[in-house]
Amino acid sequence: MKKTAIALLAWFVSSASLAATPWQKITHPVPGAAQSIGSFANGCIIGADTLPVQSDNYQVMRTDQRRYFGHPDLVMFIQRLSHQAQQRGLGTVLIGDMGMPAGGRFNGGHASHQTGLDVDIFLQLPKTRWSQAQLLRPQALDLVSRDGKHVVPSRWSSDIASLIKLAAQDNDVTRIFVNPAIKQQLCLDAGSDRGWLRKVRPWFQHRAHMHVRLRCPADSLECEDQPLPPPGDGCGAELQSWFEPPKPGTTKPEKKTPPPLPPSCQALLDEHVL
């Protein structure tokens, strides 16, 4: 468990030690009507909103990294979700990375989060608000066992399941990425109300947080949506395949060269980065 905790901490701070990308040189949102451009893993945003860091319902972690920008739809989703969580007595929602002022590629830690439509939310719901020191150096709570096959019972709670369900039931949300073991536990706990599980997708890591993705806004004409998740609750063979050992000869995919930016994003960089 100690090694896992160290790995999680390294994941959350890794970006601080890497070389900056051109997008990090843009320190304020680009003026204009809100437009998410390109794909979640290759895009940018014009007219991003700033998530207010002061709220009774949520707290923003690592504000020194300045990753609390997003499309107005994302800001409203966070406010909506955290209000619902407070109404139900779940606790304070802890907000992690959203995007940079103009979106674009991070220097580490994320492949997506580029169009202002993604947010990481800790799977912790403290009843006592965190101090500024805790928020600047958050301690991730690993919910998954060392073998990756199930959640840790002492760390899992119905409140966490309720938070994920609330997010999945939001009409603007298209996908929520969690660790396969977390998805498995949600499948076990869901009962007969299972429609929302379709949006909850198993993915690597994501042992302590959920990654919520919104659909492209209707007026963002250059935004590229993903196909909808497959029909059904996703609790069958697809989920179980995540727990099977790798097939013989399986190797890690080679790191790909980033594709060219959408023309509108390249033009934005050319105009705002010297």
UniProtKB/Swiss-Prot annotation:
Zn(2+) 2 binds at D147, H150. InterPro entries: Hedgehog_sig/DD-Pept_Zn-bd_sf, Peptidase_M74. It holds the Pfam family Peptidase_M74. Its cofactor is Zn(2+). Keywords: Disulfide bond, Hydrolase, Metal-binding, Metalloprotease, Periplasm, Protease, Signal, Zinc. Its main location: periplasm. It is an enzyme of class 3 (hydrolase). Residues 1-19 form the signal peptide. One of its GO terms (biological process) is peptidoglycan metabolic process. Its EC number is 3.4.24.-. Binds 2 Zn(2+) ions per subunit. Zn(2+) ion 1 is bound in the active site. Zn(2+) ion 2 is bound at the dimer interface by residues from both subunits. Disulfide bonds join C44-C265, C187-C235, C216-C223. Murein endopeptidase that cleaves the D-alanyl-meso-2,6-diamino-pimelyl amide bond that connects peptidoglycan strands. Likely plays a role in the removal of murein from the sacculus. Dimer. This is Penicillin-insensitive murein endopeptidase. It comes from Salmonella heidelberg (strain SL476). The lineage of its organism: Bacteria, Pseudomonadati, Pseudomonadota, Gammaproteobacteria, Enterobacterales.
